[in-house]
Design a protein with these regions (language model features):
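Lipid interaction determinants
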Residues: 2-9, 17-145
Length: 145
C-alpha cells in the first residue's frame, strides 16, 4: 500500500513539472507586438510600426486570439499546427473588431486585412513571423513585455 502512495506522489509531482501548454502548441499563452509589415510588392516594401504597442496579438490556450489594432480591439479563433520545431501552419477565423475611428495615419485596415491572410508562422531570432497567403507578405512580431 505504501508503494502505491509513493508512486502516486511521484506521478503528481512529475505532472506539476510539465509544460503549461500541450506539446506541439508553441503559440498558446504567448503575447506579441507588431514591429513591421513586409510586402512582396515593391510599391509597398517594408513598413515599420511606429508604436508596436498599438498592434498586438495574444494567443490563448483555448484556441482564441485577442487583438489590439490601433484604437480598436477584437478577438478571433485560430488554428495552428506545427510543421517543424520552429514553424507551422496558422490561420485566424473571422475577426470581431470594434469599429472606432482611429486617428490618421493608421495601419488598422492594412493590419486587419493581413491578419485574415495569415497562413503560416515561423520563430526566428526571438521573433514571430507570420507569412501571408500566396507569399504576399510577412508580419514581423516581437514578444510583448
Amino acid at each position: 500500500m505504501r508503494t502505491f502512495q509513493i508512486l502516486g506522489a511521484v506521478a503528481v509531482a512529475l505532472t506539476a513539472c510539465g509544460p503549461s501548454s500541450p506539446p506541439g502548441r508553441p503559440l498558446d499563452g504567448t503575447n506579441w507586438r507588431l514591429v513591421s509589415l513586409e510586402s512582396m510588392s515593391d510599391e509597398q516594401g517594408t513598413t515599420a510600426v511606429d508604436d508596436p504597442g498599438k498592434y498586438t496579438v495574444s494567443f490563448g490556450a483555448d484556441q482564441r486570439a485577442a487583438f489590439r489594432v490601433d484604437c480598436n480591439r477584437g478577438n478571433s479563433t485560430f488554428q495552428a499546427a506545427p510543421g517543424g520545431p520552429d514553424s507551422g501552419t496558422l490561420t485566424f477565423g473571422p475577426i470581431a473588431l470594434t469599429r472606432m475611428f482611429c486617428p490618421q495615419p493608421s495601419l488598422e485596415q492594412r493590419v486587419t486585412t493581413a491578419l485574415g491572410q495569415v497562413r503560416s508562422y515561423r520563430f526566428a531570432d526571438g521573433r514571430l513571423h507570420m507569412s501571408l497567403l500566396a507569399d504576399s507578405g510577412i508580419l514581423h512580431w516581437e514578444p510583448a513585455g
